[in-house]
Design a protein with these regions (language model features):
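ABC ATP-binding cassette signature C-motif
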Residues: 1-146
Length: 146
């Protein structure tokens, strides 16, 4: 069995008048591919945000392996306007390394997704915006992509 990277245990989110979900357990290990399925409003996006560390549960716990990186790709990505796509994607690198190397990685990732790194982020189609968001999520080579 692979070593867990993320674990949610007995997790629940309360909306005040009702529980969105309760008693949820999820373990993500290296190489796992998981699919969340449920009706609208069941809490799938909320659960993903919890796993990414972007929210707080009302009960339960989240554990992540020390030093792992997590990228979160939201359902409807919001990209900054008026920037080159390379600059948008470089925001995904975290800016903690060599600027030149990060720029090359951003450009390579955009090229992989058939996008022009010099193109401005204004006026992208929905599909193009989605590909830019995916490039931004993948450029830092995360251990977990949500």
């Amino acid at each position: 069995m692979a070593t867990p990277l993320l674990t949610l245990a007995n997790t629940g989110v309360n909306l005040g008048d009702r529980w969105l979900f309760r008693h949820v357990d999820v373990t993500v290990s290296a190489g796992d591919r998981l699919c969340l399925v449920g009706r609208n409003g069941a809490g799938k996006s909320t659960l993903m945000k919890l796993m990414a560390g972007l929210g707080e549960a009302d009960e339960g716990s989240l554990w992540s392996a020390p030093g792992i990186s997590v990228s979160y790709l939201p359902q409807a990505p919001k990209l900054p306007r008026g920037m080159s796509l390379a600059s948008v994607v470089m925001h995904g690198t975290g800016g903690d390394g060599d600027f030149i190397a990060e720029a090359h990685r951003a450009e390579a990732m955009l090229t992989r997704f058939e996008l022009d790194p010099g193109m401005l982020s204004d006026g992208l189609s929905g599909g193009e915006a989605r590909r830019v968001a995916l490039a931004r999520a993948l450029v830092k080579e995360p251990d977990v992509l949500l």
